[in-house]
C-alpha cells in the first residue's frame, strides 16, 4: 500500500473499511476499501472480499462506483475507487427522524417528490445488475450514496453474487448458516459476517428462513427503502432490540405517515414490494419502475369521486328543460330546440376528469358539457364559464369550445361510419382543459387563469343514449393551495385584490415554487386587467422580469410570450419561447412550456394557420411525443397542398412522413424558420444522405439564407475528400454537391458561363434546384436572356419525365416575352383550364397571367374568383388586379407570402400596369429577410 496515503476512515461495514486516501502516483483522492484486520485471516471472507471487488469492476453503470485497481498480494487485500463527496441515504433519513418541525431546506430534500427520482435511479441500477446476472443482497439506505452533484450510487458489493452461482451453496455449507425460527426473528441493521449474508432488517422473510436469494429478495429490500422514503419511518414500530415476528401487521405508508400526503396507489406500490409472499411482489424491477412512472412523469392519479346518472334527478341540483339558445347562442344548428339541462349537486375540484360514453344518435342534434362557476350557477347564470358542444352530422364529429358564450375553438373530424357509440374524456385543471375522443386528443385549451368553473352541467336531448358520468379527482387536488385565495379574487375579476395576495405569497415563500408561481399569476393578472380595461399590453412585461434567473426562470419567458401573443407580436413570442426551451431544457417547468406550444398549435390552426406551421415545427423538434398518430394524419391533410407545391417533395416521390427530418426541413422551408437547418445538415451528413443534403442546400438558397448556404458549403468542403455516398443513393459524390454550390455562387455573381460549366457536372435534381433558385431573381432583375440560356442548356439533354419539372419555367419565359401562342399551347396541352386544375398549382396562376396578357381584365378577375379559399395565395394574387393586397398577407405562411409578392409582381407586369404599381411588390419581395441573391 505504499502508493496510497490513508487520510481518514470514512465508512465501516460488516467485512470492510473504507478510507479516504491519496493516490501518490496519480496525485488524486481515492476511496480505498480494505478487509477488516480482525477478519483478514478468514480465507472465505478474503475470497468474498475479492469477489466483491471483481463484481464491482465488471459492472459499468452511472449508479455503480467504478473500480480503479485491485490488490491481493501478500497480506494486503484492498481495492480503490473514485472518491465521491456526499452522504448516505441513511444519514438523510436519520436527519429527520423524530423531528416535529423541519427546516424548509430539509423538508424539500425529504419530500416524496424529491425522493422518487432518487429511488428510480436506485431501481435503474439494480435493474442493470439483474440484467447482468448479479444479485446485490444487501440493499439498504447505508449502501446508497447521494453525491453533492446529483449522483446516486450503490456501494458495498460484499454480499453480491451471480445468480445460480456455486457460491450460494458453498455459503450455506461452509458458513454454517444459522437456522431461524419463523415465529421469532430478531431483526438487525448490520451485516453479520460469517453467519448470514445481508442485513437482517432489510432481508426478505424467505431469506431469513434460508431460502436461496433471487431478484425478489432485492425487490423486497427496495420496497423497504421506498417505504422509508414515503414515511420517513421504518415499517416496524418497535423498540431497539425487541424481537418481532415478521407476520406482524405492517401499516401501509398512507396510514403510517398521514401527514405526508402519500397517494394511495403509491402506498400500495410499496406494500406490494414488501409482500411476505414473494409471489405477491413485483415480478421484476422493470415492473416496479413502470408502476412508478406516472409519479415520475407528473401524471396525476385519479380516483372516482362521484357517478352521476343522467336519468336520476337526485344526482342533480337543477333538472329542467331549457332553450338551447340561452346557453349556446353562437351555434348555428337548431338553437331554438328544447333540451334537458342538468346541473350537478356535487362540486368538482380544480383537477377533475369527466368520463362517459354516448351514442351517435344522442348527439345528432348536439349535446353540451358545461363547467360553471358556483356563484354564477347559484344565480342561474349558466352561460358563464366554459362549455363544450358535441354534434355529429354525416359521420363527422364536431366539438366547439365556448367561453362565456363565445366560441373560441372548433374542430371537426370524420368518425368511423359503423361506430355507433364513442367514449369521451374531459380533463380539467386550474388552467387547462383537454378533450379526448376514443383516447385521441381532440381539443386542448390553456387559459393560464384558474377560472374553469367548479359545477358540472349537461345539456342533451336523448337521455337514453348517454351512459353514467364518472367524475374523478386528482389526488393532487386534495391539497389546498395558498394560491386559492387570490385565484378566487381573480375569477371574480377583482384584479387589485388578487394582485395584493399574489405579492404577499411571492414575498412569503422566497425561493419556493409558491413564490414564483404567485409572481407568474400576478403578471398574467396584470396582463388580463390591461387587456380588459384598455392600455399598453407591454406594460405587463416588467411583472415577468421579477422571475429572471430564479427558480421559476422559464416562466419569465412564458409570461412574456403571452404578452407578445396578445399584442400580436408573433416573432417576439417565438423568440421568448425558444430562449426558454433552449436555456432551461432540463428545468422542471419546461413541460409547461411544451404544453403551451401544443395549445398554441391547436389555437393557431383555428385562428392563424400561418402561425400553426411554426408551432408544428417546434413541437416536432422539442416534444414530438405530444402529437398522437391520429393527429399526424390530420396535420398531413392540412399541409397536403403545400407538399404538392414544394419542389423537393415533387422530386422525391416517397410519401412525406410526419416524424422525419424531411418534414422538419419542409416546415423550415415554408415558415422561413432556419434555426434548425444546421442540425438537419449535421444529421444528413452523418447518415451520408445525399438527397437530404441537396434538399437542405436548396432550402437555404431559395429562402435567401446566404449565411447558412455558405456555412454548409464550407462544412462540405472540409469532408469532400473523405466521403463517398453509398450505392443505395446512386454512389453520388460530395464533389457533385460542390459543383452545385460553386455553380449557384457563379449565378449569384452573374458569371453565367462558369455556372453552366459547373452545373453541367451535376445530376438533374441539382440543376433543377439551381434553376429554381435563379429564376425569381432573373425576373426581378429583368435578366431573362441569361435565364433562358441556362434553361435551354439544362432542357436539351433531359428526358421527357425530367422536362415536366421545368415546363413551368418555359411558360413563364413565354409570358414574359409576350409570346402568347407558345404560352397558350403549352398551357392548354399540359394544364387544360378545367375544374380539375387545382387553385394552389403554379399552372392556375400562369393561366391568370396569360389572360392578363390578352388584355381581358374581366376574364382575369373571373378566373381568380373561382378560388375557394378567399385568403389563399391564388385568391390574393387575383385581388391585386384592382387594389393592394398587403393588408391580407399576414394570413399567409412566410414562403407563401414571398411567392404571392413575386407572382403579383409578375401578373401586374403581364397586365402592363404602371411601374409604380408592380414596383411596390418587387420591393416588398426584396425587403423580406434572407434574400439569397441580394
Swiss-Prot record:
It catalyses: L-seryl-[protein] + ATP = O-phospho-L-seryl-[protein] + ADP + H(+); L-threonyl-[protein] + ATP = O-phospho-L-threonyl-[protein] + ADP + H(+). Together with the serine/threonine kinase Pkn1, may play a role in the specific interactions with host proteins during intracellular growth. Pfam families: Pkinase. CDD domains: STKc_PknB_like. It is an enzyme of class 2 (transferase). Belongs to the protein kinase superfamily. Ser/Thr protein kinase family. This is Serine/threonine-protein kinase PknD. GO terms for molecular function: ATP binding; protein serine kinase activity; protein serine/threonine kinase activity. The lineage of its organism: Bacteria, Pseudomonadati, Chlamydiota, Chlamydiia, Chlamydiales. The keyword Kinase applies. The active site is at 138 (proton acceptor). It comes from the Bacteria. ATP binds at residues 10-18, 33. The keyword Acetylation does not apply. It comes from Chlamydia trachomatis serovar A (strain ATCC VR-571B / DSM 19440 / HAR-13). Its EC number is 2.7.11.1. Residues 4-296 form the Protein kinase domain. Autophosphorylated on serine and threonine residues.
